[in-house]
Amino acid sequence: MAKKPKSVKDTNNMVVASNRKARHNYSILETYEAGVALVGTEVKSLRDGTASLADAFATVDDGEIWLRNLHIPEYHHGSWTNHAPRRNRKLLMHRREIDNLVGKIRDGNLTLVPLSLYFTGGKVKVELALARGKQAHDKRQDMARRDAQREVTRELGRRVKGMTN
């Protein structure tokens, strides 16, 4: 059986983009997986590994979830049929999930933030988070907690090294 050449990328389980600032600016309550309705040149551009979730967010309009401000650059081999880089893209979820999300968003002053964009079995998926925005003092508390944890880990490492020497 012939093997694939090593130069060919396996895009079946590839993370295309991740929103690293989302975990800093929001406290994540729940995560969901949704499909993304795309056109052909968008998928080809994503297979090149170029996309930006930096300013992206999701909204609910007329019972449908839309991903806004996701930047997928134009496909470099595309012609006049190329897509608009920042167009609104429909997210594909079950009706029960959408209704559940709408209720939670309205009740708890929450928002939908995309965390990552990836391929699963040839299909493009987005990991959405139901999140609440952090204020400045929340961010400072998180930083202090991480610093304290880092100090504990460092001290434990020193003690273990001291015992083995």
Swiss-Prot record:
InterPro entries: SmpB, SsrA-bd_prot, SsrA-bd_prot_CS
GO terms, biological process: trans-translation
One term under GO cellular component: cytosol
Signal sequence interval, chain numbering: none
Subcellular location field: Cytoplasm
Biased composition annotated in UniProt, kind: Basic and acidic residues: 135-158
GO molecular function list: RNA binding
Protein purpose: Required for rescue of stalled ribosomes mediated by trans-translation. Binds to transfer-messenger RNA (tmRNA), required for stable association of tmRNA with ribosomes. tmRNA and SmpB together mimic tRNA shape, replacing the anticodon stem-loop with SmpB. tmRNA is encoded by the ssrA gene; the 2 termini fold to resemble tRNA(Ala) and it encodes a 'tag peptide', a short internal open reading frame. During trans-translation Ala-aminoacylated tmRNA acts like a tRNA, entering the A-site of stalled ribosomes, displacing the stalled mRNA.
Protein name: SsrA-binding protein
Organism per entry: Mycolicibacterium gilvum (strain PYR-GCK) (Mycobacterium gilvum (strain PYR-GCK))
Gene symbol of the encoding locus: smpB
